[in-house]
């Protein structure tokens, strides 16, 4: 069976309205729901689908069908989000508006039902809308028959409250993580917060917060989707921040402190992601709510730190507004009263920080625990502080900012009593009026109990410094507070036991004798509170308590310290050299530090430059990577969009083809049925029952119909012709009878017409005569007024002419004045333009002269630089030539030494030395410090040479080996300066002592390896016949 043809949305809506009109709302909803969830609906235009969705929403709200509404809205969002986002917002707003309207109507109905009850009766307070009926309520409804307010609200209002809550949740699920529907998502979240606040829905508020938190966490997971939100976008992040701040405000109003703290963490996470700084008004709200949360959790240290941050923000906002650098919309409005109130709370909250730990376990052990450290680190990060706050640091910060002058007088006096001039014997008397003033203020009343704990701690700490034991009665008398805040002896003993349990106090209570004994173990170590402890005091006992005198334990513990200090002072007086050496060492260290400071500073600057360059490179790489990622993502998104668009176009094209084909088939079938019905009812003479309808088509039916119509037409023409003949005979008879009575009728008609004419003529003449008489009378009456009218008109004309002349002259005067003014302005403008042109010309000339002067200076600098470079180049050439001469001399000396060694080895006298040029530079003479070995000295040999007349046996002539190529201007090693078969050079002629050569060098001088620029077989063959082939050094030694 083929699928049913697609029905247009207009027809579906019309059918649903018809069903609603006859009371079939569920059937209408079913029809609309099936149409919207059908795949064929995707090709329908959005403008025709929107009324269908609005009707579905109305029916779902009326029947409380949240599941059907959710399915339809999801399908509609998938259809419309790529083309028209506004229609989705319209439908969802309508959905929420109808649900809220139903809740209001339900409340009105419940009020009408309970109009006979007392107006002050408690309202319904169902803890969980998803668990309305509990076993207890069912049993109570069964046993009790009375209709109470709670039962009425539970039966009438609560179901609609549950439906409204499901509506908000459904809308948020539909709009989540969609950048196009982001504004609507934030608006719906704010409406849901207001719903929870208005109806005090604490359970639903927790679920709502968890739902929004999951949406943000899943945003990164689904970031690759087509319309996913981007938390890196400042506007998106700002909207989420606004939502979280509203969530924080509602949580504080509902007193859900855990949810408020989690909202604070969400805000801190979003602020860490934000690239733009948060507004001061938002941060002020942030710190204010955070202070309230810490106060409820009795974390007085971080409560005071939050107040301190809030006060700093108010000061910054006031300074910004005073300097005119910010707007009132972004900065909280601050007055002097607000600053005084904030300063008072900062100081009071700091005073309320416990000096010792207030937790039930041992403070020292808990503070070391890793969980406690992590918690304190988290709280410190939430406050935006670099390190955990302490009581001493908060007081120091408050004093530096002058909070003591801004605070209220009683708070200032309380600070002086507790921190500056604490006296245990009179503390309660001094503080009683102050506590009464603080207790009278509802906002400050919460600090009375922690202040009592601080006072008791100070009291016992200072009593332990003075007394070893005191009576309980005496302690009870000292700890007397005003009446509303009176402390009983049991509370004091509980405080003592708690302090002893944690190790903060060392007190024993003897109830028999009624005495308090302070522990005075001289070998006990004083406990130092751990930084960041739960109590909040990170200061040592010495810094937090006014020292009256040292305890025996401190005296025993500090004995070695005092002894060392005394010995140090004695050594300084007894041995002056000790002090001098200490001062000298200090001065040496200072000099060394000063000497290395400049270098260290330069290294630090260099490291800073390197770090900045690395940071810039990392930032550039990160930005480049982000740009590439964004480009890839944008290209991928465009490709996906194009592919999706092409797919939708293909599907729409296929659906259109199929729809046209189905429509053609349907029209063909309907036409066939219609023709059959016409043949059956309209055309006579054809028996349809005898026709085979299976083989019948439109052409055959049309031919049958035309044949039958032609037959009927012929029959009709025959009947008309017969009837016409009959009518012609009757008409001819009627006219023959009328001819007899026509003359009589003509005479009667003529007489009636003459009578009517005479009557009309007489009446017309009478009316004309009457009108003439009336016109003549009117002329006589008006003729008397003509002179007066003419004089009046002349008068008015003269006045108007005079007025016109006055106005014309005034206009001419104004024209002349404005003309003169215009001429003056034009002259002034031309003069000003001329001056500007002259000034511009002068500036241009000055600029050209300056440019010419700079060009000449630049040319002179270039000439000077070229001259300097030429001089430096000449100096380098001279230096290179000098080095070449030195290298040549060195080479010559080495060749002479090698020649002497070769001659000495051969047992021959050295040949006459070649003439050697005198050195151009003076060098120190070489000294032969080696001892004589029995041979003649060089002087003896020189004398023998002179006696022989300078003649010497010539060495056998040998072919001179080709000199190796030498690199210009560089050092040439000895083995590259001469070939292995070269003859030894003659010794120098000036008689300079030869250079010492090691034995292994002398032995291997005759078998020098080939130079690096020669091949092993490049040398000419020597006399020994061994120069044609390269032989390793070790093999040459073996051959020798």
Swiss-Prot record:
Residues 339-523 form the PCI domain. GO terms for biological process: formation of cytoplasmic translation initiation complex; translation reinitiation. GO terms for molecular function: mRNA binding; translation initiation factor activity. Residues 92-121, 608-906 form a coiled coil. Residues 908-917, 945-955, 978-993, 1004-1018 have a biased composition (Low complexity). Gene3D superfamilies: 1.25.40.860, UVR domain. It is found in: Cytoplasm. Component of the eukaryotic translation initiation factor 3 (eIF-3) complex. HAMAP family: eIF3a. Belongs to the eIF-3 subunit A family. This is Eukaryotic translation initiation factor 3 subunit A. It comes from Aspergillus terreus (strain NIH 2624 / FGSC A1156). The lineage of its organism: Eukaryota, Fungi, Dikarya, Ascomycota, Pezizomycotina.
């Amino acid at each position: 069976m083929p699928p049913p043809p697609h029905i247009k949305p207009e027809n579906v809506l019309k059918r649903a309205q018809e069903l609603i009109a006859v009371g079939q709302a569920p059937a209408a909803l079913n029809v609309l729901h099936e149409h919207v969830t059908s795949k064929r609906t995707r090709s329908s235009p959005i403008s025709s689908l929107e009324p269908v969705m609005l009707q579905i929403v109305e029916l779902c709200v009326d029947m409380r069908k949240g599941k059907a509404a959710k399915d339809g809205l999801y399908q509609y969002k998938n259809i419309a989000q790529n083309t028209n986002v506004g229609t989705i917002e319209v439908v969802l707003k309508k959905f929420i508006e109808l649900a809220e309207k139903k809740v209001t109507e339900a409340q009105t109905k419940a009020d009408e039902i309970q109009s006979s009850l007392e107006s002050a009766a408690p309202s319904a307070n169902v803890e969980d809308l998803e668990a309305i009926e509990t076993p207890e309520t069912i049993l109570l409804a069964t046993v009790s028959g009375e209709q109470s307010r709670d039962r009425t609200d539970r039966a009438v209002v609560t179901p609609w409250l549950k439906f409204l809550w499901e509506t908000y949740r459904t809308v948020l699920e539909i709009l989540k993580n969609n950048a196009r529907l982001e504004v609507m998502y934030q608006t719906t979240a704010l409406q849901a917060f207001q719903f929870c606040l208005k109806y005090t829905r604490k359970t639903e508020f927790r679920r709502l917060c968890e739902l929004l938190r999951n949406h943000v966490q899943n945003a990164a997971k689904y970031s690759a989707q087509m319309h996913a939100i981007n938390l890196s976008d400042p506007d998106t992040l700002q909207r989420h921040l606004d939502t979280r701040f509203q969530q924080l405000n509602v949580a504080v109003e509902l007193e859900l402190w855990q949810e408020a703290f989690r909202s604070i963490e969400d805000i801190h996470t979003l602020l860490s992601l934000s690239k733009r700084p948060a507004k001061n008004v938002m941060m002020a709200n942030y710190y204010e709510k955070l202070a309230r949360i810490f106060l409820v959790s009795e974390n007085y240290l971080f409560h005071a730190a939050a107040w301190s941050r809030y006060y700093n923000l108010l000061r910054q906002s006031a300074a910004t507004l005073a300097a005119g650098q910010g707007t009132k919309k972004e900065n909280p409005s601050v007055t002097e009263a607000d600053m005084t109130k904030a300063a008072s709370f900062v100081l009071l909250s700091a005073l309320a920080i416990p000096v010792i730990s207030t937790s039930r376990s041992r403070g020292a052990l808990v503070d070391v625990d890793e969980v406690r450290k992590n918690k304190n680190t988290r709280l410190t990060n939430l406050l935006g502080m670099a390190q955990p706050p302490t009581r001493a640091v908060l007081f120091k910060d408050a004093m530096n900012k002058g909070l003591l002058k801004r605070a209220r007088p009683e708070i200032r006096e309380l600070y002086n009593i507790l921190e500056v001039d604490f006296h245990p014997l009179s503390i309660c008397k001094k503080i009683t009026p102050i506590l009464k003033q603080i207790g009278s203020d509802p906002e400050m009343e919460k600090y009375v109990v922690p202040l009592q704990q601080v006072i008791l701690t100070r009291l016992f700490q200072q009593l332990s410094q003075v007394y070893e034991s005191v009576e309980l009665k005496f302690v009870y008398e000292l700890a007397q507070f005003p009446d509303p805040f009176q402390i009983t002896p049991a509370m004091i003993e509980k405080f003592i036991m708690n302090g002893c349990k944690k190790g903060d106090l060392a007190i024993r209570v003897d109830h028999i004798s009624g005495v308090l004994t302070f522990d005075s173990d001289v070998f006990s170590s004083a406990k130092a509170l751990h930084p960041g402890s739960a109590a909040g005091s990170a200061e040592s006992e010495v810094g937090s308590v006014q020292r009256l005198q040292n305890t025996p334990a401190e005296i025993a513990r500090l004995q070695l310290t005092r002894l060392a200090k005394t010995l140090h002072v004695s050594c300084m007086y007894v041995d002056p050299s000790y002090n001098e050496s200490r001062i000298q060492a200090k001065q040496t260290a200072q000099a060394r530090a000063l000497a290395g400071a400049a270098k260290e500073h330069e290294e630090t600057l260099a490291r800073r430059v390197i770090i900045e360059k690395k940071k810039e490179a990392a930032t550039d790489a990160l930005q480049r990577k982000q740009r590439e990622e964004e480009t890839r993502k944008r290209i991928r998104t465009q490709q996906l969009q194009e592919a999706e668009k092409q797919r939708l176009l293909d599907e729409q094209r296929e659906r259109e083809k199929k729809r046209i084909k189905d429509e053609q088939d349907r029209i063909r079938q309907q036409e066939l049925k219609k023709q059959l019905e016409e043949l059956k009812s309209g055309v006579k003479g054809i028996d349809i029952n005898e026709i085979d309808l299976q083989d019948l088509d439109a052409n055959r039916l049309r031919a049958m119909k035309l044949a039958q119509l032609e037959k009927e037409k012929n029959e009709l023409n025959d009947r008309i012709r017969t009837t016409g003949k009959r009518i012609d005979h009757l008409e001819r008879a009627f006219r023959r009878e009328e001819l007899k009575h026509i003359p009589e009728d003509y005479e009667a008609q003529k007489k009636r017409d003459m009578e009517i004419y005479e009557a009309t003529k007489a009446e017309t003449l009478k009316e004309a005569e009457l009108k003439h008489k009336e016109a003549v009378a009117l002329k006589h009456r008006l003729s008397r007024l003509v002179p007066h009218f003419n004089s009046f008109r002349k008068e008015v004309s003269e006045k108007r002419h005079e007025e016109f002349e006055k106005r014309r002259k005034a206009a001419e005067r104004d024209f002349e004045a404005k003309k003169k003014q215009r001429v003056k302005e034009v002259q002034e403008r031309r003069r000003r333009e001329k001056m500007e042109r002259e000034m511009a010309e002068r500036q241009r000339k000055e600029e050209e002269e300056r440019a010419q002067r700079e060009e000449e200076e630049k040319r002179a600098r270039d000439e000077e630089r070229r001259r300097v470079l030429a001089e430096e180049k000449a100096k380098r050439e001279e230096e290179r030539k000098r080095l070449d001469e030195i290298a040549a001399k060195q080479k010559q000396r080495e060749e002479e030494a090698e020649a002497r060694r070769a001659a000495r080895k051969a047992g021959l006298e050295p040949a006459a030395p070649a003439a050697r040029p005198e050195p151009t530079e003076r060098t120190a003479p070489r000294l032969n410090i080696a001892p004589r070995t029995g041979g003649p000295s060089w002087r003896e040999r020189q004398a023998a040479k002179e006696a022989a007349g300078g003649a010497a046996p010539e060495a056998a002539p040998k072919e001179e080996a080709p000199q190796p190529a030498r690199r210009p201007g560089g050092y040439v090693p000895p083995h590259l300066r001469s070939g292995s078969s070269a003859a030894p050079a003659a010794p120098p002629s000036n008689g300079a002592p030869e250079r010492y050569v090691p034995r292994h060098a002398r032995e291997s001088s005759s078998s020098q390896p080939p130079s690096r620029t020669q091949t092993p077989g490049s040398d000419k063959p020597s006399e020994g016949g061994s120069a044609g082939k390269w032989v390793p050094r070790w093999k040459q030694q073996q051959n020798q």
